[in-house]
Amino acid sequence: MERKSRTAIIGLLLLLMINTYSISAGKKPSGRQNREDTLRINALEFEEIDITKVKGMNAPDDVTVVLDNDTLKFDFNSDKINPKYYGILRNLIEYINVNNYRVTVVGHTDSKGTNVYNMKLGMRRAENAKKKLLELGLSADKIAGVESRGEEEPVATNDTSAGRALNRRIEFKLQK
């Protein structure tokens, strides 16, 4: 019973975040600030969301999903997706399918290395995330594309190792 209550609360929090997004969607984000068009989801919560309860409940037409709590982050200079993230990706696939989204996978890096190298590394990360989504069952027609932002859109400072780790990430842009 406690798990059902927790799942219901998490589902409601997700809906609240989506509705908050809908209200603030008209604003254009700037580089280092947290983007207002981003739905940040704690991955532990995302693993437990009952996707069927979210279907058709004010799901926005466009939203960017970033899984927080140091999830789907990459090691320095790596484009490999850790198997511990596969469950989270399966739930993302279900969310995409239930809400009839298409996804653009966007790769990001920290600021170490040249801009040219980081753009290529970000693209490899996005391509590997796309490949894993397809391997885990997402239909190819649900993939809108892959992009790299390299080091151009940090979410944390690049002056510390902790900040750089947060910047090495994947974002999923969902569009209806």
Segments (PLM) and residue ranges:
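Periplasmic OmpA-like peptidoglycan-binding domain that tethers envelope proteins to the cell wall
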Residues: 108-176
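Bacterial N-terminal signal peptides that target proteins for export
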Residues: 2-9
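Sec/Tat signal peptide C-region and signal peptidase I cleavage site
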Residues: 20-24
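Hydrophobic helical h-region of N-terminal Sec-dependent signal peptides
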Residues: 10-18
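Glycine/serine-rich loop-strand microenvironments at binding/catalytic pocket rims
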Residues: 86-119, 175
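Periplasmic peptidoglycan-binding/tethering modules of Gram-negative envelope proteins
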Residues: 26-101
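Generic marker of residues within folded, mature protein domains
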Residues: 15, 55, 64, 93-95, ...
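Structural recognition of the beta-strand scaffold that forms the well-ordered cores
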Residues: 66, 73, 104, 145, ...
